[in-house]
Amino acid sequence: MIDKVYIGLVQKNSTLFGFVYRLGELYRRLPFPSPVYYINRKMAYILQEYLLRHPADVIITPHLYPAEIITNMKKMGMEVPPSIFVATDYACIPFTEETDCDDVVIPSEKLIPEFRKYGIPKEKLYPLGIPTADTGVERISPEEAKRQLGLDPAKEYLLIAGGSMGAGALEEVVEILYRVRSLHKCKLIMVCGNNQQLYSRLQKRYADKIELVGYTDKMPLYLKAGSIFITKPGGLSSTEAAAARIPLIHICPIPGCETKNMQFFKKTGMALAVTNPKEELTAAVLSLQKQENRKKMIQCQEKYVPGTATAQLGQLVEEGKK
C-alpha cells in the first residue's frame, strides 16, 4: 500500500513529493513526534503478534516506517529483538532522529556530522555503506554479459533507467541520447521498470531502434553490459551502480533525498550530475566516453563504495548476538 502511494506520487507529481519532503524537514524542528510516528503506533501490536509467532534474533530495517514501529514497541514496554536501521539514502531523512533502533548503519563516514546534527548518538552510528547483493556478475566480462542478455557483444550500449517507476522526463532523455547514439555508433537500452505507459510510447516511437526493457531481475547484467549508466539518483540503485563500477550520470532527481544523493555522488566524484538534460546531458555522455574520465570516476567508486558493506553488516549482526 505504502509503495503504491509513493510510486504513484513520484510518477505523477514529483514536485508535490518534494513539497511534502520539505514539510518533513520543517516539521522535524518541532519538539514533538511526527504524524509518521503516531500512524505507525497502530502497527506495534501487529508486529508484536508476528514476532511471537515468528521469533527473530535481530531485526534489520532499511525503511523508516518499521523503525518507527520498533520505537513505539519499545516505548510501550514490549519486548523487541536487537534492531538495526540501515539508511539507504545519502542523507539523514526527516524523522530518522525520532527512531530508537539499537544501531544505525549509514552510507559513509562523511555523513556522520549530518546524523549527529539531528541527534543520533555517535556510538550508534556505523558508516559501513549501503549493502548490495553479490550477484557474481562482477566476475564475468562485459562481452559475456551482453551475450547472456542477447545483445551484440561487439556493440557499445548506453543504459538508461528511471528506477522501478520510471521518470517523467525520460522520454526527453531518450530523444537526446538517441541523437548522441547516432553520432557515436552505440545503442540505447531503456529500462522502463513498471512504467507500462512509458514503455508503450517509446515502443511506438522508436520500435527496434533502441532496446526496450520492462521490469527485469537482470539489472546486474545490464550494469555489466553498459558503457555508461544514466539514471535517477536513488540511494540503493546508485550504490548498486557504483558497486558495478560503471560510469554514472544522474538525472531527474525527485526533490528531497534524491537531490541529496545526487549532491553526494557529484561531490565524491562517483557520478556526474545533470540538472538540465537539454543543455548538459550530451556533454556529460561525451565526457565519460573519454577513458581518463571513466577511469577517474571508477576509482572514486572503488574508494567510497568498496563493496564490503554486506559482510560488515553481517559481522555487526553476529557481534550483537553475542
Q: Where are the model-predicted features located?
A:
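C-terminal "capping" alpha-helix adjacent to the active site of nucleotide-linked donor transferases
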Residues: K267-G269, N276-N293
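A short, well-ordered alpha-helix in the C-terminal region of glycosyltransferases
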Residues: N293-G307
